[in-house]
Amino acid sequence: MTEAANSTPAQPEFQIQRIYVKDVSFEAPNTPVVFQKEWQPEIKLDMDTQTQVLGQDVYEVALTLTVTCKLGEETAFLCEVKQAGIFTAANLDAQNLAHCLGAFCPNILFPYARETVAGLVSRGSFPQLNLAPVNFDALFASHIAQLEAEQAKAGVQ
């Protein structure tokens, strides 16, 4: 009975230790002129994630959102938010750990980053900006498929 208990694989563990804003930037380089123009904005959202190992089974995941708003050729505003979290992820195989850090954690961080962006845009006296939800699972799957295709292509050459 003791042998069976010792041979049982450890259960996967996941825990949020902390969520915080790591960096924030807001620029409105063409104010007040842009306030007098017709509001037909072109919004561009760029996202990036970085992962850093902090200790055994402890990771920092940082999600960076860069929102650029243009009116024609002029930049109305540029907003960048780096939202980060410290997570414990233990007893996961490499594939599940990669998914956890590359999709699950950014999915947790996104609402916080979206709220920070909305607040900054509002404080800049611009119309409300609500970023649409992001499917991080699909983005992660696409990224893995792209990596596998590149590896297959490199193996063929």
Curated annotation (Swiss-Prot):
Superkingdom of this entry's organism?
Bacteria
Instruction: Give the matching InterPro entries.
Output: SecB, SecB-like_sf
Cytoplasm as a keyword of this entry, yes or no, is: yes
What is a single Pfam family found in this protein's UniProt entry? SecB
Tell me the Gene Ontology biological-process terms attached to this UniProt entry. protein folding; protein tetramerization; protein transport
Q: Which UniProt keywords apply?
A: Chaperone, Cytoplasm, Protein transport, Translocation, Transport
GO CC, alphabetical: cytoplasm
Protein localization? Cytoplasm
Q: Which GO terms describe its molecular function?
A: unfolded protein binding
Give yes or no: UniProt keyword Metal-binding: no
Q: What does this protein do?
A: One of the proteins required for the normal export of preproteins out of the cell cytoplasm. It is a molecular chaperone that binds to a subset of precursor proteins, maintaining them in a translocation-competent state. It also specifically binds to its receptor SecA.
Q: Which PANTHER family match?
A: PROTEIN-EXPORT PROTEIN SECB, PTHR36918
Entry-linked HAMAP family: SecB
Q: Which family does it belong to?
A: Belongs to the SecB family.
**UniProt subunit comment:** Homotetramer, a dimer of dimers. One homotetramer interacts with 1 SecA dimer.
What name has this protein been given in UniProt?
Protein-export protein SecB
Q: Which organism is it from?
A: Tolumonas auensis (strain DSM 9187 / NBRC 110442 / TA 4)
Q: What is the lineage of its organism?
A: Bacteria, Pseudomonadati, Pseudomonadota, Gammaproteobacteria, Aeromonadales
